[in-house]
Amino acid sequence: MNQRQLMQMAQQMQRQMQKVQEELAATIVEGTAGGGAIVVKMNGHREVQSITISPEVVDPNDVDMLQDLLLVAINDASRKAQQLAEERMQPLTGGLKGLF
């Protein structure tokens, strides 16, 4: 393989990675807690897009529970977004884990 072919392959891979990055930005995953009482929507770049809180879990006397549920939902969405990114990037990275 000559240098020109290597450059073409690198450019093609760069275009494919850009396409995957755009797809990740447009793909939404949901993390939930409390049986769906809290829903966090996050894109494939792990940017929170929205948080929905059911009024039933808003208790001014138990703010700790609400905070715990939010953490669970955010972490759930983050794990799903990470898994999505790994799945989408896997064909381009040859299965190397932990890059994205």
UniProtKB/Swiss-Prot annotation:
The keyword Manganese does not apply. The keyword Transit peptide does not apply. Gene3D superfamilies: Nucleoid-associated protein YbaB-like domain. It is found in: Cytoplasm, Nucleoid. One of its GO terms (cellular component) is cytosol. InterPro entries: YbaB-like_sf (IPR036894), YbaB/EbfC (IPR004401). It comes from the Bacteria. Pfam families: YbaB_DNA_bd. Its main location: cytoplasm. Keywords: Cytoplasm, DNA-binding. Signal peptide: none annotated. One of its GO terms (molecular function) is DNA binding. Binds to DNA and alters its conformation. May be involved in regulation of gene expression, nucleoid organization and DNA protection. Homodimer. Belongs to the YbaB/EbfC family. NCBIfam families: DNA_YbaB_EbfC. PANTHER family: NUCLEOID-ASSOCIATED PROTEIN YBAB. This is Nucleoid-associated protein Cagg_3200. It comes from Chloroflexus aggregans (strain MD-66 / DSM 9485).
